[in-house]
């Protein structure tokens, strides 16, 4: 039983490191891919519905 634990722990450790490295690489790719225009569009998409709801609440629509 003990002889199986070491390889399994090593495998788990290596898989965890590999997963972490892949996640960091993916985040770096997403940051490179995001352009300022795309970020502004995302902010506008989130901002416009809020403004619409606010105005409809004020004018009693």
From Swiss-Prot:
This is Temporin-CG3. Expressed by the skin glands. Belongs to the frog skin active peptide (FSAP) family. Temporin subfamily. Pfam families: FSAP_sig_propep. It is found in: Secreted. Disulfide bonds: none annotated. Keywords: Amphibian defense peptide, Antibiotic, Antimicrobial, Cleavage on pair of basic residues, Cytolysis, Fungicide, Hemolysis, Secreted, Signal. Residues 23-44 form a propeptide. One of its GO terms (cellular component) is extracellular region. Antimicrobial peptide active against a variety of Gram-positive bacterial strains but not against Gram-negative bacteria. Has weak antifungal activity against a slime mold isolate. Has weak hemolytic activity against human erythrocytes. Residues 1-22 form the signal peptide. The keyword DNA-binding does not apply. Transmembrane segments: none annotated.
């Amino acid at each position: 039983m003990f002889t199986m634990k070491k390889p399994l722990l090593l495998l788990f450790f290596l898989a965890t490191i590999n997963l972490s490295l892949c996640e960091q690489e993916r985040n770096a790719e997403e940051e490179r891919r995001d352009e300022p225009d795309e970020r502004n569009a995302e902010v506008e998409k989130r901002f416009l519905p809020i403004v619409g709801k606010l105005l409809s609440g004020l004018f009693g629509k």
